[in-house]
């Protein structure tokens, strides 16, 4: 699948999606951008004990997240849930 065939969000956008786990990281299926998924950046940097608690809290839920980085050539989208929670 070619990423540039689909529209991607911009850094700073707030988007909504459903959280799921893949390869010990949390990803979000984006409702507004079909065929796109984003990775929760903070889930990659966490210690395993904290990650398990975070995973149990979020997997399967629909959440709003803030886009922190987008690689338009590769189609990678990094989002942050914690930054979104601070602004609410």
Swiss-Prot record:
Coiled coil: none annotated. It comes from the Viruses. This is Protein K3. Residues 43-53, 74-79 are annotated as: Binding to host EIF2AK2/PKR. GO terms for biological process: symbiont-mediated suppression of host innate immune response; symbiont-mediated suppression of host PKR/eIFalpha signaling; symbiont-mediated suppression of host type I interferon-mediated signaling pathway. Viral mimic of eIF-2-alpha that acts as a pseudosubstrate for EIF2AK2/PKR kinase. Inhibits therefore eIF-2-alpha phosphorylation by host EIF2AK2/PKR kinase and prevents protein synthesis shutoff. Determinant of host species specificity. The lineage of its organism: Viruses, Varidnaviria, Bamfordvirae, Nucleocytoviricota, Pokkesviricetes. Interacts with host EIF2AK2/PKR kinase. SMART domains: S1 (SM00316). Keywords: Host-virus interaction, Inhibition of host innate immune response by virus, Inhibition of host interferon signaling pathway by virus, Inhibition of host PKR by virus, Interferon antiviral system evasion, RNA-binding, Viral immunoevasion. GO terms for molecular function: peptidase inhibitor activity; protein serine/threonine kinase inhibitor activity; RNA binding.
């Amino acid at each position: 699948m070619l990423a540039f065939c689909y529209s991607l969000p911009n850094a700073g956008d707030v988007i909504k999606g459903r959280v799921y786990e893949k390869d010990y990281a949390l990803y979000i299926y984006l409702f507004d951008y079909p065929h796109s998924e984003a990775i929760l950046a903070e889930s990659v940097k966490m210690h395993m004990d904290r990650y398990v608690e975070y995973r149990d809290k979020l997997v399967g839920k629909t959440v709003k997240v803030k886009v922190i980085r987008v690689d338009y050539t590769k189609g990678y989208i990094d989002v942050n849930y914690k930054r979104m929670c601070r602004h609410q």
